[in-house]
């Protein structure tokens, strides 16, 4: 009997692993959801989900936790993607936070993130009773994410205890949870930032235009270039936006996301820039610098 063997490239191996994880969760859990933050990792994760269930649609909705401070380009891209693929998109906003006027300028990055992202996410998970939530986090991004399992177990309050996680042997995942508990699932755990960009290029995946370099209005604060995306951003005395060619390596709330000066306006240019980069993509995320161990503390409280 002749048997055909296949030598998969490392990207195809990562793709196969991620699709396996997505299908496992769809089969094991009653009410899964895919967190869609509109960034490059979300774009790849959604692409993998579409592949996993082609020609059908993914058997779970997308959930976007809208802080009301995302870049305008992100919101228009989100709506375009949902319409293009006919996806079930849930947009959740913490209305109590909106009533209180919570924002990054008035309440600071830590409180804004807690109320409009962490608490809002937990509200949505409780409201729709999701028992598994896909996220696009990768282990190479940040040290607390480096020690997180693919199946990351959360208690009834959505809190993460890094000392109380289950072993994962090879590709065997234990999805049993008690009533009220849930898991966060990270199909891209073993991908790197470079893998993401190479896959986007090879698969021709649409991404938010903010990832490409263009001349944009920015101000420099504490060594970080912040894009002036709308008229809600208060300018300091004597501060004037500068027009610079910039792009973003990571996306979030616009007042809390730093741009980098760049001329890379094509995917090959971005990949070339990535190969020469010596800093983390999250260097521009203000929320990661709120305090030492900031990301781990947020995850313990229920953040993704």
Curated annotation (Swiss-Prot):
Pfam families: PAPS_reduct (PF01507). Gene3D superfamilies: HUPs. GO terms for molecular function: ATP binding; sulfate adenylyltransferase (ATP) activity. It is an enzyme of class 2 (transferase). It catalyses: sulfate + ATP + H(+) = adenosine 5'-phosphosulfate + diphosphate. It comes from the Bacteria. Pathway: Sulfur metabolism; hydrogen sulfide biosynthesis; sulfite from sulfate: step 1/3. Keywords: ATP-binding, Nucleotide-binding, Nucleotidyltransferase, Transferase. Its EC number is 2.7.7.4. One of its GO terms (biological process) is hydrogen sulfide biosynthetic process. With CysN forms the ATP sulfurylase (ATPS) that catalyzes the adenylation of sulfate producing adenosine 5'-phosphosulfate (APS) and diphosphate, the first enzymatic step in sulfur assimilation pathway. APS synthesis involves the formation of a high-energy phosphoric-sulfuric acid anhydride bond driven by GTP hydrolysis by CysN coupled to ATP hydrolysis by CysD. Belongs to the PAPS reductase family. CysD subfamily. Heterodimer composed of CysD, the smaller subunit, and CysN. PANTHER family: SULFATE ADENYLYLTRANSFERASE SUBUNIT 2. This is Sulfate adenylyltransferase subunit 2 2. It comes from Marinobacter nauticus (strain ATCC 700491 / DSM 11845 / VT8). The lineage of its organism: Bacteria, Pseudomonadati, Pseudomonadota, Gammaproteobacteria, Pseudomonadales.
């Amino acid at each position: 009997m002749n048997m055909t063997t296949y030598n998969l490239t490392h990207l195809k191996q990562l793709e196969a692993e991620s699709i396996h994880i997505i299908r496992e969760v769809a089969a094991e859990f009653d009410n899964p959801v895919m967190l869609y933050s509109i960034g490059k990792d979300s774009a790849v994760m959604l692409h993998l989900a579409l592949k996993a269930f082609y020609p059908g649609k993914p058997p779970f909705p997308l959930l976007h936790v809208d802080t009301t401070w995302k870049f305008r380009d992100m919101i228009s891209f989100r709506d375009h993607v949902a319409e293009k693929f006919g996806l079930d998109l849930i947009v959740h906003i913490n209305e109590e936070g909106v009533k209180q006027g919570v924002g990054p300028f008035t309440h600071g990055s830590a409180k804004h993130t807690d109320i409009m992202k962490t608490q809002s996410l937990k509200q949505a998970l409780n409201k729709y009773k999701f028992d598994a939530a896909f996220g696009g986090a990768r282990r190479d991004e940040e040290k607390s994410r480096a020690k997180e399992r693919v199946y990351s177990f959360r208690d009834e309050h959505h809190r993460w205890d890094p000392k109380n996680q289950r072993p994962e042997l090879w590709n065997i995942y234990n999805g049993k949870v008690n009533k009220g508990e849930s898991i966060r699932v990270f199909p891209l755990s073993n991908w790197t930032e470079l893998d993401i960009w190479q896959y986007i290029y090879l698969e021709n995946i649409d991404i938010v235009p903010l990832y490409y370099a263009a001349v944009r209005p920015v101000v420099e604060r504490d060594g970080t270039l912040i894009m002036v995306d709308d008229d809600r951003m208060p300018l300091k005395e004597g501060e004037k936006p500068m027009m610079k060619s910039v792009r973003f390596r990571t996306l979030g709330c616009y007042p809390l996301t730093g741009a980098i000066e760049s001329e890379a306006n094509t995917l090959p240019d971005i990949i070339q820039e990535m190969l020469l980069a010596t800093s983390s993509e999250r260097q521009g995320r203000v929320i990661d610098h709120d305090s030492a161990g900031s990301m781990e503390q947020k995850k313990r409280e229920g953040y993704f």
